[in-house]
Design a protein with these regions (language model features):
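A secondary-structure boundary/capping signal
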Residues: 37-38, 49, 146
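Cytochrome P450 core scaffold surrounding the K-helix E-X-X-R motif
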Residues: 44-50
């Protein structure tokens, strides 16, 4: 398996992207690593790039690995991961599509399956790519999907 992977690190408002290389993380229990096959450019990504949304003013530490519309294949499974969210068996090499945000699964919105309304949801790509697990957005070779 690959030891390192590349991603596009966005340096911030008025700046550009830089290709960076980081170690491919081993997934924690309940997590997995996706080998990205396809990533789309969303309108919100264009707003960041044009400088219309200042991520640093929103409290983000730069650089970030943006991109939240992507799909790929399972590269590594963390301990305890045997099925997908529908209960179907999941193995390395399986094609998958997934959410870029992580809902809590316990609030009123989640229990109604309205995951985008979860007040506690977390977004991986809002964290700098300079810290583990590095691959937290769609513009790269891998994506770390947390438990």
């Amino acid at each position: 398996m690959a030891q390192t992977g590349r991603l596009a690190a966005w340096l911030g408002k008025g700046k550009t992207f830089e290709i960076r290389e980081y170690p491919v993380p081993d997934p924690k229990p309940g997590a997995l690593v996706i080998k990205i096959a396809l990533a789309n450019v969303c309108g919100s990504d264009m707003h960041y790039w044009k400088g219309e949304l200042d991520m640093e003013k929103r409290g983000r530490t730069m650089p970030i690995n943006p991109g939240h519309e992507h799909m790929g294949t399972v590269y590594k499974l963390g301990a305890g991961v045997a099925t997908d969210s529908a209960g179907q068996p999941l193995r390395e090499g399986d094609r998958v599509i997934y959410r870029y945000f992580i809902p809590c699964g316990r609030c009123k919105a989640c229990l109604r399956r309205q995951f985008k309304s979860c007040p506690s949801r977390q977004s991986n790509w809002s964290v700098t790519c300079d810290v583990w697990p590095h691959f937290q957005g769609g513009y790269g070779e891998y994506f770390y999907l947390g438990p």
